[in-house]
Protein backbone atom coordinates (compact mmCIF):
# COMPACT_ATOMS: atom_id res chain seq x y z
CA UNK A 1 0.00 0.00 0.00
CA UNK A 2 2.83 2.39 0.82
CA UNK A 3 5.92 1.72 -1.37
CA UNK A 4 8.65 4.04 -0.03
CA UNK A 5 7.68 6.24 2.85
CA UNK A 6 10.27 8.61 4.33
CA UNK A 7 9.77 8.63 8.04
CA UNK A 8 10.95 11.87 9.61
CA UNK A 9 11.46 12.24 13.31
CA UNK A 10 9.59 9.12 14.39
CA UNK A 11 8.44 9.23 17.97
CA UNK A 12 6.32 6.68 19.75
CA UNK A 13 2.61 7.51 19.98
CA UNK A 14 -0.47 5.58 21.07
CA UNK A 15 -2.51 6.91 18.14
CA UNK A 16 -3.73 3.85 16.13
CA UNK A 17 -4.13 5.68 12.82
CA UNK A 18 -1.52 6.57 10.18
CA UNK A 19 -0.77 10.23 9.67
CA UNK A 20 -1.92 11.34 6.22
CA UNK A 21 0.70 14.10 5.84
CA UNK A 22 3.94 12.15 5.74
CA UNK A 23 6.29 14.94 4.76
CA UNK A 24 5.16 18.01 6.63
CA UNK A 25 3.73 16.95 9.96
CA UNK A 26 6.00 16.62 12.97
CA UNK A 27 3.84 13.84 14.39
CA UNK A 28 5.41 10.42 14.04
CA UNK A 29 4.36 7.76 11.57
CA UNK A 30 2.34 5.44 13.70
CA UNK A 31 2.34 1.71 13.19
CA UNK A 32 -1.19 0.26 12.89
CA UNK A 33 -2.39 -2.80 14.72
CA UNK A 34 -2.54 -5.13 11.71
CA UNK A 35 1.11 -5.12 10.67
CA UNK A 36 1.21 -2.75 7.75
CA UNK A 37 5.02 -2.41 8.11
CA UNK A 38 7.14 -5.04 6.30
CA UNK A 39 9.92 -7.18 7.74
CA UNK A 40 12.57 -4.59 6.80
CA UNK A 41 10.90 -2.08 9.02
CA UNK A 42 10.47 -4.58 11.82
CA UNK A 43 14.23 -5.32 11.64
CA UNK A 44 15.15 -1.71 12.22
CA UNK A 45 17.71 -1.87 15.03
CA UNK A 46 17.64 1.60 16.54
CA UNK A 47 15.27 1.29 19.47
CA UNK A 48 15.19 5.03 20.10
CA UNK A 49 13.80 6.07 16.69
CA UNK A 50 15.14 9.59 16.88
CA UNK A 51 15.88 12.37 14.45
CA UNK A 52 17.64 10.80 11.45
CA UNK A 53 15.92 10.08 8.14
CA UNK A 54 15.26 6.45 7.31
CA UNK A 55 13.62 4.73 4.38
CA UNK A 56 11.06 2.18 5.38
CA UNK A 57 9.93 -0.30 2.76
CA UNK A 58 6.36 -1.47 3.08
CA UNK A 59 4.38 -3.93 1.02
CA UNK A 60 0.68 -4.07 0.42
CA UNK A 61 -1.32 -7.23 0.78
CA UNK A 62 -4.85 -7.90 -0.24
CA UNK A 63 -5.84 -8.25 3.38
CA UNK A 64 -4.74 -4.67 3.98
CA UNK A 65 -7.10 -3.06 1.43
CA UNK A 66 -9.95 -1.07 2.90
CA UNK A 67 -13.26 -2.64 1.87
CA UNK A 68 -16.16 -0.18 1.87
CA UNK A 69 -19.09 -1.25 4.00
CA UNK A 70 -22.30 -2.04 2.11
CA UNK A 71 -24.85 0.80 1.95
CA UNK A 72 -27.47 0.84 4.66
CA UNK A 73 -30.84 -0.48 3.52
CA UNK A 74 -33.49 2.22 3.00
CA UNK A 75 -35.82 2.75 5.94
CA UNK A 76 -39.14 0.94 5.62
CA UNK A 77 -42.01 3.09 4.29
CA UNK A 78 -43.90 4.89 6.99
CA UNK A 79 -47.28 3.34 7.67
CA UNK A 80 -50.08 5.60 8.87
CA UNK A 81 -53.31 4.72 10.54
CA UNK A 82 -56.31 4.63 8.15
CA UNK A 83 -58.03 7.93 7.43
CA UNK A 84 -59.84 9.00 10.60
CA UNK A 85 -62.75 10.29 8.53
CA UNK A 86 -63.50 7.57 5.94
CA UNK A 87 -61.09 4.73 6.82
CA UNK A 88 -59.47 4.89 3.36
CA UNK A 89 -55.68 4.56 3.03
CA UNK A 90 -54.01 7.53 4.71
CA UNK A 91 -51.38 9.63 2.96
CA UNK A 92 -50.09 11.18 6.19
CA UNK A 93 -51.11 13.59 8.94
CA UNK A 94 -53.10 16.52 7.60
CA UNK A 95 -54.55 19.32 9.73
CA UNK A 96 -53.87 17.33 12.87
CA UNK A 97 -55.12 13.83 12.02
CA UNK A 98 -54.27 10.89 9.80
CA UNK A 99 -56.25 11.45 6.59
CA UNK A 100 -56.47 10.40 2.96
CA UNK A 101 -55.89 12.84 0.10
CA UNK A 102 -59.63 13.03 -0.61
CA UNK A 103 -60.67 14.05 2.90
CA UNK A 104 -57.67 16.40 3.22
CA UNK A 105 -58.68 18.26 0.05
CA UNK A 106 -62.38 18.25 0.94
CA UNK A 107 -61.70 19.76 4.38
CA UNK A 108 -59.31 22.38 3.00
CA UNK A 109 -61.77 23.51 0.30
CA UNK A 110 -64.67 23.57 2.74
CA UNK A 111 -62.85 25.80 5.23
CA UNK A 112 -61.13 28.06 2.71
CA UNK A 113 -64.33 28.69 0.75
CA UNK A 114 -66.56 28.85 3.85
CA UNK A 115 -68.83 26.26 2.27
CA UNK A 116 -72.29 25.76 3.78
CA UNK A 117 -73.66 22.26 3.35
CA UNK A 118 -77.05 20.78 4.16
CA UNK A 119 -77.94 17.24 5.17
CA UNK A 120 -81.36 16.24 3.83
CA UNK A 121 -81.56 13.21 6.05
CA UNK A 122 -81.07 13.24 9.83
CA UNK A 123 -77.51 14.62 10.10
CA UNK A 124 -76.26 11.17 11.04
CA UNK A 125 -75.07 9.76 7.70
CA UNK A 126 -72.43 7.03 7.83
CA UNK A 127 -69.17 8.30 6.35
CA UNK A 128 -66.80 5.73 4.89
CA UNK A 129 -64.78 5.16 1.73
CA UNK A 130 -67.92 4.33 -0.28
CA UNK A 131 -70.38 6.86 1.14
CA UNK A 132 -68.13 9.86 1.81
CA UNK A 133 -69.30 11.79 -1.29
CA UNK A 134 -73.00 11.33 -0.61
CA UNK A 135 -73.41 13.83 2.21
CA UNK A 136 -70.92 16.65 2.42
CA UNK A 137 -72.54 18.09 5.56
CA UNK A 138 -71.95 14.91 7.56
CA UNK A 139 -68.50 14.47 6.03
CA UNK A 140 -67.45 17.93 7.21
CA UNK A 141 -68.88 17.26 10.67
CA UNK A 142 -66.93 14.01 10.81
CA UNK A 143 -63.74 15.89 9.87
CA UNK A 144 -64.28 18.25 12.78
CA UNK A 145 -65.24 15.46 15.19
CA UNK A 146 -62.05 13.49 14.57
CA UNK A 147 -59.97 16.59 15.24
CA UNK A 148 -59.20 18.31 11.93
CA UNK A 149 -58.17 21.88 12.71
CA UNK A 150 -59.70 24.88 10.98
CA UNK A 151 -56.85 27.00 12.27
CA UNK A 152 -54.31 24.77 10.52
CA UNK A 153 -56.09 25.38 7.22
CA UNK A 154 -56.08 29.14 7.80
CA UNK A 155 -52.40 29.14 8.74
CA UNK A 156 -51.61 27.06 5.68
CA UNK A 157 -53.63 29.43 3.56
CA UNK A 158 -51.84 32.49 4.96
CA UNK A 159 -48.48 30.87 4.27
CA UNK A 160 -49.55 30.08 0.73
CA UNK A 161 -50.73 33.64 0.24
CA UNK A 162 -47.30 34.96 1.21
CA UNK A 163 -45.57 32.46 -1.04
CA UNK A 164 -47.96 33.23 -3.88
CA UNK A 165 -47.35 36.96 -3.49
CA UNK A 166 -43.60 36.43 -3.80
CA UNK A 167 -44.07 34.13 -6.75
CA UNK A 168 -46.47 36.54 -8.42
CA UNK A 169 -43.68 39.05 -8.94
CA UNK A 170 -41.69 36.42 -10.79
CA UNK A 171 -44.47 34.99 -12.91
CA UNK A 172 -44.76 35.98 -16.52
CA UNK A 173 -48.41 36.03 -17.49
CA UNK A 174 -48.03 34.92 -21.08
CA UNK A 175 -50.72 32.91 -22.84
CA UNK A 176 -49.37 29.82 -24.54
CA UNK A 177 -50.79 28.93 -27.97
CA UNK A 178 -52.72 26.02 -26.45
CA UNK A 179 -54.21 28.24 -23.76
CA UNK A 180 -55.18 30.89 -26.30
CA UNK A 181 -56.86 28.22 -28.40
CA UNK A 182 -58.82 26.94 -25.41
CA UNK A 183 -59.94 30.43 -24.38
CA UNK A 184 -61.15 31.09 -27.91
CA UNK A 185 -63.00 27.77 -27.92
CA UNK A 186 -64.79 28.61 -24.66
CA UNK A 187 -65.54 32.17 -25.81
CA UNK A 188 -67.07 30.85 -29.03
CA UNK A 189 -69.14 28.26 -27.15
CA UNK A 190 -70.50 30.99 -24.87
CA UNK A 191 -71.29 33.45 -27.65
CA UNK A 192 -73.01 30.82 -29.81
CA UNK A 193 -75.31 29.78 -26.98
CA UNK A 194 -75.87 33.14 -25.27
CA UNK A 195 -76.21 36.36 -27.31
CA UNK A 196 -74.97 39.49 -25.57
CA UNK A 197 -77.23 42.31 -24.45
CA UNK A 198 -76.23 44.58 -27.32
CA UNK A 199 -77.33 41.94 -29.84
CA UNK A 200 -80.89 41.74 -28.53
CA UNK A 201 -83.90 43.77 -29.49
CA UNK A 202 -85.44 44.57 -26.13
CA UNK A 203 -89.16 44.49 -25.53
CA UNK A 204 -91.19 44.85 -22.35
CA UNK A 205 -94.60 43.92 -20.99
CA UNK A 206 -96.96 45.73 -18.64
CA UNK A 207 -97.94 42.56 -16.79
CA UNK A 208 -97.86 43.16 -13.01
CA UNK A 209 -95.06 45.70 -13.35
CA UNK A 210 -96.01 47.85 -10.36
CA UNK A 211 -96.61 45.58 -7.38
CA UNK A 212 -95.58 42.14 -6.27
CA UNK A 213 -98.00 39.23 -6.31
CA UNK A 214 -97.52 35.57 -5.45
CA UNK A 215 -97.43 34.55 -9.13
CA UNK A 216 -98.44 36.10 -12.46
CA UNK A 217 -99.53 33.12 -14.54
CA UNK A 218 -98.92 34.83 -17.89
CA UNK A 219 -95.41 35.85 -16.87
CA UNK A 220 -94.76 32.36 -15.52
CA UNK A 221 -95.79 30.75 -18.80
CA UNK A 222 -93.41 32.98 -20.75
CA UNK A 223 -90.64 32.60 -18.19
CA UNK A 224 -90.87 28.80 -18.07
CA UNK A 225 -90.79 28.63 -21.88
CA UNK A 226 -87.62 30.74 -21.99
CA UNK A 227 -86.05 28.75 -19.16
CA UNK A 228 -86.53 25.50 -21.05
CA UNK A 229 -84.76 26.96 -24.07
CA UNK A 230 -81.96 28.29 -21.88
CA UNK A 231 -81.39 24.83 -20.41
CA UNK A 232 -80.99 23.41 -23.91
CA UNK A 233 -78.50 26.14 -24.80
CA UNK A 234 -76.56 25.35 -21.62
CA UNK A 235 -76.29 21.70 -22.71
CA UNK A 236 -75.01 22.86 -26.11
CA UNK A 237 -72.47 25.08 -24.36
CA UNK A 238 -71.23 22.15 -22.27
CA UNK A 239 -70.80 19.93 -25.34
CA UNK A 240 -68.38 22.45 -26.85
CA UNK A 241 -66.12 22.64 -23.78
CA UNK A 242 -62.71 20.94 -24.07
CA UNK A 243 -62.95 17.37 -22.83
CA UNK A 244 -66.56 17.44 -21.62
CA UNK A 245 -67.78 14.81 -24.08
CA UNK A 246 -64.92 12.48 -23.11
CA UNK A 247 -66.60 11.99 -19.72
CA UNK A 248 -69.09 9.21 -19.22
CA UNK A 249 -72.68 10.07 -20.12
CA UNK A 250 -73.63 9.57 -16.48
CA UNK A 251 -71.04 12.11 -15.33
CA UNK A 252 -72.06 14.59 -18.04
CA UNK A 253 -75.64 14.47 -16.79
CA UNK A 254 -74.59 14.68 -13.15
CA UNK A 255 -72.53 17.81 -13.86
CA UNK A 256 -75.27 19.43 -15.92
CA UNK A 257 -77.92 18.84 -13.28
CA UNK A 258 -75.64 20.14 -10.54
CA UNK A 259 -74.43 23.30 -12.31
CA UNK A 260 -77.23 24.29 -14.67
CA UNK A 261 -78.84 26.79 -12.33
CA UNK A 262 -75.43 28.25 -11.47
CA UNK A 263 -74.83 28.94 -15.15
CA UNK A 264 -78.35 30.25 -15.82
CA UNK A 265 -78.11 32.73 -12.94
CA UNK A 266 -74.64 33.86 -13.98
CA UNK A 267 -75.83 34.39 -17.54
CA UNK A 268 -78.99 36.33 -16.76
CA UNK A 269 -77.06 38.54 -14.32
CA UNK A 270 -74.68 39.61 -17.09
CA UNK A 271 -77.76 41.06 -18.83
CA UNK A 272 -78.62 43.31 -15.92
CA UNK A 273 -79.22 47.01 -16.64
CA UNK A 274 -78.62 48.89 -13.37
CA UNK A 275 -80.10 52.23 -14.47
CA UNK A 276 -83.47 50.61 -15.08
CA UNK A 277 -83.07 47.72 -12.62
CA UNK A 278 -84.07 45.23 -15.31
CA UNK A 279 -82.90 41.91 -16.71
CA UNK A 280 -83.18 40.80 -20.32
CA UNK A 281 -83.80 37.26 -21.55
CA UNK A 282 -82.47 35.73 -24.74
CA UNK A 283 -85.49 36.66 -26.84
CA UNK A 284 -85.24 40.30 -25.73
CA UNK A 285 -87.96 40.17 -23.06
CA UNK A 286 -86.95 42.70 -20.41
CA UNK A 287 -88.46 42.48 -16.92
CA UNK A 288 -88.06 44.77 -13.94
CA UNK A 289 -87.46 43.51 -10.43
CA UNK A 290 -91.16 43.30 -9.57
CA UNK A 291 -91.95 41.36 -12.73
CA UNK A 292 -89.08 38.93 -12.10
CA UNK A 293 -90.57 38.27 -8.67
CA UNK A 294 -94.02 37.69 -10.12
CA UNK A 295 -92.72 35.48 -12.94
CA UNK A 296 -91.65 32.83 -10.44
CA UNK A 297 -88.45 34.01 -8.76
CA UNK A 298 -90.37 34.98 -5.62
CA UNK A 299 -88.10 35.35 -2.57
CA UNK A 300 -85.09 34.55 -4.77
CA UNK A 301 -85.49 37.84 -6.65
CA UNK A 302 -83.54 40.20 -4.43
CA UNK A 303 -80.68 37.71 -4.06
CA UNK A 304 -80.31 37.46 -7.83
CA UNK A 305 -80.40 41.23 -8.32
CA UNK A 306 -77.86 41.74 -5.53
CA UNK A 307 -75.56 39.23 -7.22
CA UNK A 308 -75.98 41.06 -10.53
CA UNK A 309 -74.89 44.30 -8.85
CA UNK A 310 -71.82 42.55 -7.45
CA UNK A 311 -70.81 41.46 -10.95
CA UNK A 312 -70.82 45.00 -12.33
CA UNK A 313 -67.39 46.09 -10.93
CA UNK A 314 -65.79 42.98 -12.44
CA UNK A 315 -66.68 44.12 -15.98
CA UNK A 316 -66.48 40.56 -17.28
CA UNK A 317 -66.31 39.98 -21.03
CA UNK A 318 -67.59 36.93 -22.95
CA UNK A 319 -64.37 34.96 -22.48
CA UNK A 320 -64.41 35.45 -18.71
CA UNK A 321 -68.11 34.65 -18.39
CA UNK A 322 -67.63 31.54 -20.52
CA UNK A 323 -64.59 30.39 -18.54
CA UNK A 324 -66.31 30.98 -15.20
CA UNK A 325 -69.35 29.03 -16.44
CA UNK A 326 -67.09 26.18 -17.56
CA UNK A 327 -65.34 26.14 -14.17
CA UNK A 328 -68.74 25.95 -12.43
CA UNK A 329 -69.69 23.01 -14.63
CA UNK A 330 -66.46 20.99 -14.51
CA UNK A 331 -66.24 20.69 -10.75
CA UNK A 332 -64.98 17.41 -9.33
CA UNK A 333 -66.64 17.78 -5.91
CA UNK A 334 -70.14 17.11 -7.23
CA UNK A 335 -71.68 14.07 -5.58
CA UNK A 336 -72.17 10.75 -7.42
CA UNK A 337 -69.46 11.39 -10.02
CA UNK A 338 -67.83 8.27 -11.44
CA UNK A 339 -64.60 10.04 -12.49
CA UNK A 340 -64.19 13.02 -10.18
CA UNK A 341 -60.41 13.06 -10.72
CA UNK A 342 -60.86 13.36 -14.47
CA UNK A 343 -63.30 16.23 -13.99
CA UNK A 344 -60.72 18.03 -11.85
CA UNK A 345 -58.12 17.48 -14.58
CA UNK A 346 -60.44 19.16 -17.09
CA UNK A 347 -61.06 22.08 -14.74
CA UNK A 348 -57.39 22.79 -14.00
CA UNK A 349 -56.42 24.32 -17.39
CA UNK A 350 -59.62 26.40 -17.33
CA UNK A 351 -58.61 27.90 -13.99
CA UNK A 352 -55.11 28.64 -15.28
CA UNK A 353 -56.51 30.18 -18.47
CA UNK A 354 -58.88 32.45 -16.55
CA UNK A 355 -56.09 33.50 -14.19
CA UNK A 356 -53.72 34.51 -16.99
CA UNK A 357 -56.44 36.08 -19.15
CA UNK A 358 -57.80 38.20 -16.28
CA UNK A 359 -54.30 39.31 -15.26
CA UNK A 360 -53.37 40.28 -18.81
CA UNK A 361 -56.62 42.19 -19.25
CA UNK A 362 -56.22 44.00 -15.92
CA UNK A 363 -52.47 44.18 -15.16
CA UNK A 364 -52.99 46.66 -12.31
CA UNK A 365 -55.74 44.65 -10.57
CA UNK A 366 -54.06 41.45 -9.35
CA UNK A 367 -56.95 40.52 -7.05
CA UNK A 368 -59.57 40.39 -9.78
CA UNK A 369 -59.07 36.67 -10.47
CA UNK A 370 -59.76 35.51 -6.88
CA UNK A 371 -62.76 37.85 -6.74
CA UNK A 372 -64.21 36.11 -9.78
CA UNK A 373 -63.66 32.68 -8.28
CA UNK A 374 -65.45 33.75 -5.10
CA UNK A 375 -68.56 34.33 -7.19
CA UNK A 376 -68.84 30.57 -7.66
CA UNK A 377 -69.51 30.22 -3.93
CA UNK A 378 -72.19 32.92 -4.16
CA UNK A 379 -73.75 31.16 -7.14
CA UNK A 380 -73.95 27.87 -5.27
CA UNK A 381 -75.63 29.54 -2.33
CA UNK A 382 -78.24 31.16 -4.58
CA UNK A 383 -78.75 27.88 -6.46
CA UNK A 384 -79.48 26.05 -3.22
CA UNK A 385 -82.19 28.56 -2.40
CA UNK A 386 -83.42 28.27 -5.99
CA UNK A 387 -83.89 24.53 -5.55
CA UNK A 388 -85.92 25.21 -2.40
CA UNK A 389 -87.98 27.78 -4.29
CA UNK A 390 -88.89 25.13 -6.86
CA UNK A 391 -90.62 23.04 -4.20
CA UNK A 392 -92.99 25.88 -3.28
CA UNK A 393 -93.36 26.95 -6.91
CA UNK A 394 -94.74 23.55 -7.89
CA UNK A 395 -97.63 24.17 -5.53
CA UNK A 396 -98.29 27.67 -6.91
CA UNK A 397 -98.38 27.09 -10.66
CA UNK A 398 -101.74 26.06 -12.14
CA UNK A 399 -100.41 23.17 -14.25
CA UNK A 400 -97.48 20.82 -14.19
CA UNK A 401 -93.86 21.85 -14.27
CA UNK A 402 -92.31 21.84 -17.77
CA UNK A 403 -90.71 18.40 -18.20
CA UNK A 404 -87.14 19.52 -18.97
CA UNK A 405 -87.05 21.86 -15.97
CA UNK A 406 -88.38 19.10 -13.73
CA UNK A 407 -85.99 16.53 -15.17
CA UNK A 408 -83.02 18.79 -14.61
CA UNK A 409 -83.80 18.98 -10.90
CA UNK A 410 -84.30 15.25 -10.36
CA UNK A 411 -81.78 14.00 -7.79
CA UNK A 412 -80.03 17.36 -7.92
CA UNK A 413 -77.62 18.16 -5.12
CA UNK A 414 -79.69 21.03 -3.84
CA UNK A 415 -82.79 18.86 -3.33
CA UNK A 416 -81.95 15.22 -2.78
CA UNK A 417 -78.36 14.92 -1.66
CA UNK A 418 -76.37 16.62 1.01
CA UNK A 419 -73.94 18.03 -1.50
CA UNK A 420 -72.53 21.46 -1.98
CA UNK A 421 -75.47 23.49 -3.00
CA UNK A 422 -74.99 23.69 -6.68
CA UNK A 423 -78.01 22.32 -8.46
CA UNK A 424 -81.19 23.81 -9.66
CA UNK A 425 -83.28 24.83 -12.61
CA UNK A 426 -83.77 27.82 -14.80
CA UNK A 427 -85.62 29.79 -12.20
CA UNK A 428 -88.17 27.04 -11.86
CA UNK A 429 -88.16 23.31 -11.82
CA UNK A 430 -89.53 20.27 -10.13
CA UNK A 431 -88.17 18.28 -7.30
CA UNK A 432 -89.49 14.84 -6.77
CA UNK A 433 -88.06 11.42 -7.26
CA UNK A 434 -86.45 10.61 -10.56
CA UNK A 435 -84.04 8.30 -12.26
CA UNK A 436 -81.18 6.88 -10.26
CA UNK A 437 -78.07 9.02 -10.01
CA UNK A 438 -76.11 8.95 -13.22
CA UNK A 439 -78.91 7.45 -15.30
CA UNK A 440 -79.06 8.63 -18.89
CA UNK A 441 -82.25 10.61 -19.28
CA UNK A 442 -83.05 11.26 -22.94
CA UNK A 443 -83.84 14.97 -22.96
CA UNK A 444 -80.96 15.98 -20.73
CA UNK A 445 -78.45 13.70 -22.41
CA UNK A 446 -75.89 15.84 -24.25
CA UNK A 447 -76.18 13.56 -27.24
CA UNK A 448 -79.84 14.46 -27.70
CA UNK A 449 -79.65 18.23 -27.23
CA UNK A 450 -79.54 19.01 -30.93
CA UNK A 451 -82.46 16.75 -31.70
CA UNK A 452 -84.79 18.51 -29.30
CA UNK A 453 -87.53 20.52 -31.02
CA UNK A 454 -86.83 23.45 -28.70
CA UNK A 455 -83.14 23.61 -29.43
CA UNK A 456 -83.37 26.67 -31.65
CA UNK A 457 -81.79 29.85 -30.37
CA UNK A 458 -84.17 31.69 -28.05
UniProtKB/Swiss-Prot annotation:
Motif stretch (9aaTAD): 403-411
Instruction: Please report the stretch or stretches of sequence annotated as the NR LBD domain.
Output: 178-412
Localization (cell) = Nucleus
Keyword check for Zinc-finger, yes or no: yes
Q: Where is this region: Hinge?
A: 156-177
Biased composition regions of type Low complexity, renumbered to the chain: 436-458
Task: Report the principal subcellular site.
Answer: nucleus
One GO cellular component, as annotated: nucleus
Q: Where are the zinc fingers (NR C4-type)?
A: 83-103, 119-138
Tissue specificity remark: In the embryo, zygotic expression largely overlaps that of raraa, with high levels in hindbrain, lateral plate mesoderm (LPM) and tail bud, but in later stages rarab is expressed more broadly in the brain, pectoral fin bud and pharyngeal arches.
Biased composition regions of type Polar residues, renumbered to the chain: 49-64
Q: Which GO terms describe its biological process?
A: cell differentiation; heart development; liver development; midbrain-hindbrain boundary development; negative regulation of transcription by RNA polymerase II; pectoral fin development; positive regulation of transcription by RNA polymerase II; retinoic acid receptor signaling pathway
Which superkingdom is the protein from? Answer: Eukaryota
Q: Which UniProt keywords apply?
A: DNA-binding, Metal-binding, Nucleus, Receptor, Transcription, Transcription regulation, Zinc, Zinc-finger
Region feature Disordered, mapped onto this chain? 48-75, 411-458
Q: Which GO terms describe its molecular function?
A: DNA-binding transcription repressor activity, RNA polymerase II-specific; nuclear receptor activity; RNA polymerase II cis-regulatory region sequence-specific DNA binding; zinc ion binding
Q: What induces it?
A: Induced by retinoic acid.
**Free-text comment on this protein's domains from its UniProt entry:** Composed of three domains: a modulating N-terminal domain, a DNA-binding domain and a C-terminal ligand-binding domain. The 9aaTAD motif is a transactivation domain present in a large number of yeast and animal transcription factors.
Q: What does this protein do?
A: Receptor for retinoic acid. Retinoic acid receptors bind as heterodimers to their target response elements in response to their ligands, all-trans or 9-cis retinoic acid, and regulate gene expression in various biological processes. The rar/rxr heterodimers bind to the retinoic acid response elements (RARE) composed of tandem 5'-AGGTCA-3' sites known as DR1-DR5. Required for hindbrain development and, in lateral plate mesoderm, for specification of the pectoral fins.
Similarity-based family: Belongs to the nuclear hormone receptor family. NR1 subfamily.
PANTHER family in the cross-refs: NUCLEAR HORMONE RECEPTOR, RETINOIC ACID RECEPTOR ALPHA
Listed under subunit, the entry gives: Heterodimer; with an rxr molecule. Binds DNA preferentially as a rar/rxr heterodimer.
Protein name, please? Retinoic acid receptor alpha-B
Natural source organism: Danio rerio (Zebrafish)
Q: What is the lineage of its organism?
A: Eukaryota, Metazoa, Chordata, Craniata, Vertebrata
